[in-house]
Amino acid sequence: MAFPGPRVLVVGSGIAGLGAAQKLCSHRAAPHLRVLEATASAGGRIRSERCFGGVVELGAHWIHGPSQDNPVFQLAAEFGLLGEKELSEENQLVDTGGHVALPSMIWSSSGTSVSLELMTEMARLFYGLIERTREFLNESETPMASVGEFLKKEISQQVASWTEDDEDTRKRKLAILNTFFNIECCVSGTHSMDLVALAPFGEYTVLPGLDCILAGGYQGLTDRILASLPKDTVAFDKPVKTIHWNGSFQEAAFPGETFPVLVECEDGARLPAHHVIVTVPLGFLKEHQDTFFEPPLPAKKAEAIKKLGFGTNNKIFLEFEEPFWEPDCQFIQVVWEDTSPLQDTALSLQDTWFKKLIGFLVQPSFESSHVLCGFIAGLESEFMETLSDEEVLLSLTQVLRRVTGNPQLPAAKSVRRSQWHSAPYTRGSYSYVAVGSTGDDLDLMAQPLPEDGTGTQLQVLFAGEATHRTFYSTTHGALLSGWREADRLVSLWDSQVEQSRPRL
């Protein structure tokens, strides 16, 4: 019985795994392909849910840099998932610098509004400093290790020049700057900018285009890719326990055929393969790498997994009977006036977790509901996951009553939130280059096994956002990484065909 082409297993059906599978299925080598998904649905950290009479994104929210060089944008356009505005050339040419737009409304913890003029001044200062971090790209030595340290040093010098401001104005400026630190924590998926390495920070590449959403849900994209695969390609509720590599494994159905890799699943299934593409999140690898690979990973790759950062950014959706914000409001920013990026306060998470919340995005396109989406990163975000829905709703009701100055503000009638740190096969949101690591570690993440080229080639390959040096933390980085590993296998198969041809 002849074997029908190379056997390939893809671990994980996020956009990296699905992208790799789609590309491989169309190759003339006709690989025998299966995707092993630990959960009951595809999409990974792309997770859309019908809720409140509309669609909420519990995972990926925007296409970042929706323009011609963004493969996620191109696929979404090809599948008809974008509107005229998103597809317009004007939208694609906008250069945001990767920075969050200024809010429509700014509320403070004293129940008063903050002037847009002051917010704009502080935004200009903060994002100017963020741009200056690029000066340290590729520097062998930097004056400090982290982005946070650099920002705080520069801000301290700026504070000294605020001689015409009274004490209250200086405090308010620092409180506003603190909200920008919290926003940047959400963007970077970290607890603190003190954890983010300064030298490689500028290596992350921002594509042009005004960030856009998929009105019908981001998961429409992964659903389309899934639908393009042959039936039953994806096995759901099939968590992998251990990947045995650099071996010689057999299967009764194919006597005489040996495979260098054996994937052992939690349900006891043992699946031999020629190649395995691992697309699981870095957070999962951090927790399980010691038992997930046998033999263990090479020391350099194992060290890269430990050194790179992987944090949590969660969303909290609140549904209201009636809106208490203006009709044209898009983003409400919250400023806690007793905070400052220059002060380290070790307060109880129980009492202060909500102060890490950056504010609320007004959700469009809901039939009859009025929905706000709050963003929160770091340890405070992880603590929030441990609370009940009722506790979260109560805390945020108190926050909103305080910042609006309206103690009678009606509570939200329901809440829905993400809990990415608690998700056993994810353990967080996305990666960042942490202090002690560099872009080289992202490249190490992408390096296939075995590394020395001995034995069977390309046994275990790696994809996912944490394997892309310049687009880490993004869906387009994840998709490109899946395509990269598929292309790596295709190149191998093509070279094998070429070598097997008789020479005249």
Swiss-Prot record:
Give the catalytic activity.
Answer: N(1)-acetylspermine + O2 + H2O = 3-acetamidopropanal + spermidine + H2O2; N(1)-acetylspermidine + O2 + H2O = 3-acetamidopropanal + putrescine + H2O2; N(1),N(12)-diacetylspermine + O2 + H2O = 3-acetamidopropanal + N(1)-acetylspermidine + H2O2
Q: How is the cofactor bound?
A: Binds 1 FAD per subunit.
UniProt lists the family membership as follows: Belongs to the flavin monoamine oxidase family.
As for subcellular location, the record says: Peroxisome; Cytoplasm
Highest taxon listed in the record's lineage: Eukaryota
Q: Which organism is it from?
A: Mus musculus
UniProt-listed GO biological process terms: polyamine catabolic process; positive regulation of spermidine biosynthetic process; putrescine biosynthetic process; putrescine catabolic process; spermidine catabolic process; spermine catabolic process
Descriptive protein name: Peroxisomal N(1)-acetyl-spermine/spermidine oxidase
Task: Please name the GO terms that the record assigns under molecular function.
Answer: N(1)-acetylpolyamine oxidase (3-acetamidopropanal-forming) activity; polyamine oxidase activity
Q: Which residues bind FAD?
A: A16, E37, R45, H61, W62, V240, E465, T474, T475
* Name of the coding gene: Paox
Q: Which PANTHER family match?
A: FLAVIN MONOAMINE OXIDASE, PEROXISOMAL N(1)-ACETYL-SPERMINE_SPERMIDINE OXIDASE
Kindly list the cysteine pairs connected by disulfide bridges.
none
Induction context = By polyamine analogs.
Cofactor (UniProt): FAD
Question: Could you give the subunit structure recorded for this chain?
Answer: Monomer.
**Function, in words:** Flavoenzyme which catalyzes the oxidation of N(1)-acetylspermine to spermidine and is thus involved in the polyamine back-conversion. Can also oxidize N(1)-acetylspermidine to putrescine. Substrate specificity: N(1)-acetylspermine = N(1)-acetylspermidine > N(1),N(12)-diacylspermine >> spermine. Does not oxidize spermidine. Plays an important role in the regulation of polyamine intracellular concentration and has the potential to act as a determinant of cellular sensitivity to the antitumor polyamine analogs.
Which Enzyme Commission number(s) are listed? Answer: 1.5.3.13
> What keyword terms does UniProt attach to this protein?
Cytoplasm, FAD, Flavoprotein, Oxidoreductase, Peroxisome
Pathway in which the depicted protein is active:
Amine and polyamine metabolism; spermine metabolism
Q: Motif span (Microbody targeting signal)? A: 502-504
Q: In which tissues is it expressed?
A: Widely expressed at different developmental stages. Expressed at high level in the liver and the stomach, expressed at lower level in heart, spleen, thymus, small intestine, muscle, pancreas, uterus, and breast and expressed at very low level in brain, kidney, lung, testis, skin, adrenal gland and prostate gland.
